Structure formats: C-alpha cells, structure tokens
Design a protein with these regions (language model features):
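Active-site-adjacent substrate-binding region
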Residues: 65, 224, 230-358
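A non-catalytic alpha/beta surface segment that caps or lines the substrate-entry region
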Residues: 47-114
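N-terminal hydrophobic or amphipathic helices/low-complexity stretches enriched
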Residues: 18-70, 111, 354-358
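Solvent-exposed loop/turn segments at secondary-structure junctions
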Residues: 94-97, 113-115, 125-129, 182-186, ...
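Second-shell loop/turn segments in exported
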Residues: 38-45, 59-69, 93-97, 133-145, ...
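Acidic/histidine-rich catalytic neighborhood of metal-dependent amide-processing enzymes
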Residues: 136-255
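Cleavable N-terminal signal peptides of Sec/SRP-targeted secreted and luminal proteins
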Residues: 4-22
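Structural recognition of the beta-strand scaffold that forms the well-ordered cores
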Residues: 108-109, 118-122, 176-179, 223-229, ...
Length: 358
C-alpha cells in the first residue's frame, strides 16, 4: 500500500458514493447494539487463542504470487471455508509484471450466495517480493497474514450464530470474505505494478450479474467493503477515512468502549497499549487515504471502511515484519471488536446460549 496525500479526494469520493448508493438501492443501515450478555458471548465466551494460532501459523511463510508458498496458503484458506460449508470461488488470472507473466488467484468465500446483499471483509494474502542480504524472504506478518487469520477466525467463531440466522432487520444480508492476491508491487508502486488481484476482481464484477440480486452486478451487491491491513503489532491504531462510512467507524469505537467497560477485552492487550484506544474517534484522515485493495472498488462507488493501521506500524516493509514482532494479545482485542461488529451488522442472535464455546 502507498500513502496518498490529496486533500479533496475524500469529499469527492463521498459525493460519488452517495450518488451511486442511491442509484443501486443501498441503504444506510441502523446497526444492532448487543446486550451485556451478547457482548460477553461474542467477545469472551467465543474467544479461543489456540484456534486463532492454528489459522495464523500456516500464513507466516513467504507467499509471493505464483510460488509454492502462495499455493500452500491458498489451500489453507480454501480448505478452511470448505470445511465450514461456505461457497468458495477462485478468480484465477495471469498478468504481466516487472518479472514477466505471473499467475494470480483471488479467493471469495460466501456464507450464503443466495442472499442478495453482502457484508464484505477483505484482506490480501500475498507477501511482498523482498529478501534480506542472505536471501531470506520477507514474511509480512502484519502485511497481511494477521488480517487473513482474523477473518478466518471470525468465520469460525460466528459459525453457530450464522446457522441460527439473522433477525428480520438483516435477512437480506450475508457475510462474504475476499482474499486478494498481488496487492504488493514487485518493484515501484505504480498503476500497473500493484493491486493486481483487486483491480482484476473489481473489473470482472462490474459486468458480472449477481443472480441473487435482481439483475444488479456483483459490485452493487456489496453493502459495505471492510478492508483489513497492517494489523498485528502493539502500535496499531485506526482512524476514519471516509465520511460515507464514518457511522460504522463510530460503531467500532463504541464496541471497543463497551467491551472495555464490561472488562471483556484481553487485559494483556490493553496493558500493551498503555490504555490507548485502538479506534480513535477524534482522529479523521485529512488526506486522500492509502492506496490499497479498496481503491478499485472505491472508484466504482462501493462504500469503504478501511481498517489499516495509521501511522503505519514500525515494522512496515521491513524484514522485521515477522512473527517475533507480533503482539497476539492486541490482535485478540481487535478480533473481539471486529467479531462483535460483524455480528451486530448482521443482526445475529448473539444471546443464543447454544452458541457458547463448549
């Protein structure tokens, strides 16, 4: 990803999204608020560090596109969702790069494709083409192994609640998760050497009709596109980038506050941040944002909630972006907050005691 300092883009984007949102019938949703019992079940009872680590460990390898490491990770991700019973698609394509033609694979996992509107969580699973002086490859733990593992863990933890179904307010919504290949540039970040997977998928979905949604294309079926990136170290911090989704960011702020008040966050994770919030309500970006996998979708009017740590963590694009520099307790708290957010967005019946961890 690349930081882009352009003052007017946020306003223009908001206008575009407002216009296209009206044209596609997107509605601004009123999200559910969990009771104290629901918060406890979502944040605490469903927490399982060992399961999360089981999902993360296979991601902590070099996984540049069109390599054995990439193929291992693709299998790891697709197997996970197949076992959960989700519908899994792969978007395979070849593209010219500074190092010749490379094969890329995007992964799309959907809980129930027959439901017309999708809450999308997204990340990129590739790692940057970079090596140290001894030839050891860049791992990219925060960039973006941890975001991928968090998404996979959310799917696992909410499996029971998803099967119980949403309340009436969100019967038209399902959960969809996208794992992009080729986010990283091979050399210098340019319009053609970056975002290989997201550019390809956004272009394809613009002309691909969604059979579950009255002739709309698959981009129009996205209720909101939540992109996770640069998550895993103790110095992570999120701010709001887009006015069209600021109400959703404020929902995350409130969830963090509620979980803190009810003592439902990982205490070690909170201590590692010296009491500083993860989601900072008072901080709103005053620039055009960060060039990342949301960009091709943003340009088509898809509402974006960009959850990327800013300022970038200290290990960004350094060889030190590896497992030894992760803070799993902080990531656990982000996981708890996002799990609660997804459940609230989908109006899942979170007080169902049958879905507590056994």
């Amino acid at each position: 990803m690349k930081l882009k300092r352009i003052q007017c883009i946020c306003f223009l984007t908001a206008v575009i999204i407002a216009f296209t949102g009206a044209a596609t019938g997107r509605k601004k949703r009123s999200l559910k608020y969990s009771s104290s019992k629901g918060l406890r079940i979502l944040a605490s009872d469903l927490a399982d560090h060992n399961e999360y680590m089981r999902l993360l460990k296979p991601m902590l390898i070099a996984r540049q596109p069109d390599t054995d490491g990439s193929r291992q990770v693709i299998l790891h991700i697709t197997d996970h969702y197949n076992k959960l019973g989700w519908t899994v698609e792969t978007d395979n394509f070849a593209n010219q790069t500074p190092y010749g033609m490379k094969n890329f694979t995007n992964i799309i996992a959907t809980y129930n494709p027959a439901v017309p509107n999708k809450l999308v969580l997204a990340c990129h699973f590739d790692s940057k083409y970079m090596h140290d002086k001894n030839g050891n490859p860049f791992i990219g733990a925060i960039d973006s192994a941890v975001p991928c593992a968090i998404m996979m863990d959310i799917a696992s933890k909410l499996d029971c609640l998803l099967k119980k179904g949403s309340a009436e307010e969100a019967r038209d919504l399902t959960l969809q998760m996208i794992f992009f290949d080729g986010e990283e540039a091979y050399k210098d970040w340019t319009q053609t050497d970056s975002l290989y997977g997201s550019r390809h998928l956004a272009k394809a979905w613009k002309t691909q009709l969604d059979p579950s949604n009255s002739g709309k294309n698959r981009l129009d079926s996205i209720d909101v596109f939540v992109l996770l990136d640069l998550i895993g170290t103790a110095d992570v911090r999120f701010m709001s980038f887009f006015s069209s989704t600021h109400h959703l960011f404020e929902k995350l702020v409130r969830i963090e506050s509620d979980l803190t008040q009810h003592d439902l966050l990982n205490r070690l994770g909170a201590a590692a941040r010296n009491g500083n919030h993860l989601f900072v309500s008072s901080q709103r970006a005053q620039y055009g944002g960060v060039e990342d996998d949301h960009k091709p979708f943003l340009s088509e009017g898809v509402p974006i909630l960009h959850l990327i740590s800013y300022p970038f963590p200290s290990v960004w694009h350094k060889m030190s972006d590896d497992e030894s520099h992760l803070n799993h307790d902080v990531s656990d708290n982000i996981n708890r907050i996002l799990r609660t957010f997804v459940s609230n967005y989908l109006y899942l019946k979170d007080t169902n005691s049958a879905c507590r961890k056994k």
